[in-house]
Amino acid sequence: MVFPHIVIDETSLFILLGEISHYYQDALHAFPVLPTQYIDFALWQHDEIKSHRIQAQLNYWKNHLACAPTLSSFPTDKQRPDFLEQAGQTYSTHIDQSTVKKLREISKQYEVTIFMTLVAALQILIHRYSKQSDIVIGTPINERKHKETENLIGCFVNVVALRTKINSQHTLETLLQDIKQTSLKAYENSDAPLQTVISHLNVKRNYHHAPLYQVMIYVQSEELVIKLPDVHYEMIPAFTDTSKLDLTFYILTHHPEKFVLNIEYSTALFEASTIKKIANDFIALLENIDLLLPKKIEDFACV
């Protein structure tokens, strides 16, 4: 089974696999009919756009992204074409057990999530590569905030832009707390759809880069599992030869002993060898994050 993201989100896959497992073991007992369908959510979301609540969120994004850079300065191997096609590849590696343990301990110590710690490391990586101090990246957020949507299959994901202003005189500890606050505010204001935010900001669209951000991070914390007695199955990652953005960092954190790191990249901009180096530098940052936390950002030598 293969599904495009526009049709189904990660939570929907959990629901679908659960239903397959149920009917495989007990085909006679159907699930109750859901009182709410996806079209009800779509209509509600459409009507909500005009509400004071969404307008307030749009104003937040307008202030948060005011004068933000529209194009990342992350160096590429090839000149950006006038029309950037979505051809891409995925480089896959992993983050080892000792580093995973360290990341979990640091996140607990500083009262942040693993996601926030990974975002901080990625922002440092981008800063070191691009020399930019004002950085915007995208990240998807689960929009199942209402009980009625808990068991629905569909796409309940919105993408938000996380903006970080890096002061090289500050420590990574300070940056981590800044990212915590930025992430929490982004979640509070995540009901405003990305396309509505882009229109509200009057962002000019073009064919050679995505609006607002060109780098994304996606952290998946749960493993897709289906329980089928006496049946052997295997989940196979379905990498496609496409990339909607310059770089997308997919990090799977559900395994207790290692994290999987997949970097999807535009082959119109990057060589495979460069992506391997980027991955190694990112992992090196994570491996040494406990030593870097009290240091000034300008003193980092990870790239």
For the regions a language model picked out, list residue spans one by one.
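Glycine/threonine-rich helix-loop capping motifs at alpha-helix boundaries
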Residues: A27-V33
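A Lys/Arg-rich helix-loop hairpin that forms a DNA/phosphate-binding surface
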Residues: V33, D290-V303
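Receiver (REC) domain switch/active-site region of two-component response regulators
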Residues: S12
